[in-house]
């Protein structure tokens, strides 16, 4: 997993509440098993007018000024519903690094973290201010300081200390296990065999 320390990008507002994992990534795309390639299907029912991937020009992700946005500003209860990790894969593959919401579905919140994204909880007034930024305005998220820096203000956020450590050091669960590889090998070498 890549380290996440300080990230600067532009925002895209999608202020709907209760966007569930089926809206983020519909069930018909769950048969793919590689994390890559899901970005095309992100918000499928909203982004496209038909099954030929004709873009809906009114959907915010399809507007030219927001196409390169990497920070999503959204409503309450983002990622509710089923526990499909594919929804987080779709967000990451599309290019999002940060999702700022009023709240998150618990499992989806952890899925974002497990995939190197930073989910941040902020109150409505902060999200509304960020949603009203110009598409070219830069927003910086500093994980070490736990702060968001933007043209409309500076905002603090909370994150669990263990997750903060993992993101700052680019460690997923496998990476943490590998930190103890020598100890694991030593244990296995000295462990009595019960099958002889």
Curated annotation (Swiss-Prot):
Enzyme class (EC, first level): lyase
Organism: Streptococcus gordonii (strain Challis / ATCC 35105 / BCRC 15272 / CH1 / DL1 / V288)
Protein name: 3-isopropylmalate dehydratase small subunit
Catalytic reaction(s) noted: (2R,3S)-3-isopropylmalate = (2S)-2-isopropylmalate
Molecular function per GO: 3-isopropylmalate dehydratase activity
The EC number(s) this enzyme carries: 4.2.1.33
Pfam family, one: Aconitase_C
Subunit structure: Heterodimer of LeuC and LeuD.
Signal peptide: none
Keywords, sorted A to Z: Amino-acid biosynthesis, Branched-chain amino acid biosynthesis, Leucine biosynthesis, Lyase
UniProt lineage: Bacteria, Bacillati, Bacillota, Bacilli, Lactobacillales
């Amino acid at each position: 997993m890549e380290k996440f320390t300080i990230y600067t990008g532009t925002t895209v507002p999608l202020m709907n509440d209760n966007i569930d994992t089926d809206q983020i990534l519909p069930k018909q795309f769950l048969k793919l098993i590689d994390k890559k390639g899901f970005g095309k299907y992100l918000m499928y029912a909203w982004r496209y007018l038909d099954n030929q991937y004709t873009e809906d020009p009114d959907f915010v992700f399809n507007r030219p000024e927001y196409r390169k946005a990497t920070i999503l500003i959204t409503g309450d209860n983002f990622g509710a519903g089923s526990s499909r990790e594919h929804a987080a894969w779709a967000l990451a593959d599309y290019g999002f690094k940060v999702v700022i919401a009023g709240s998150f579905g618990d499992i989806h919140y952890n899925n974002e973290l497990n995939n190197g994204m930073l989910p941040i909880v902020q109150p409505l007034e902060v999200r509304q201010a960020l949603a009203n930024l110009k598409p070219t305005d830069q927003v910086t998220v500093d994980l070490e300081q736990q702060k968001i820096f933007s043209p409309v203000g500076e905002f603090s956020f909370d994150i669990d200390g263990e997750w903060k450590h993992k993101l700052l050091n680019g460690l997923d669960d496998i990476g943490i296990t590998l930190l103890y590889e020598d100890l694991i090998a030593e244990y296995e070498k000295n462990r009595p065999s019960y099958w002889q």
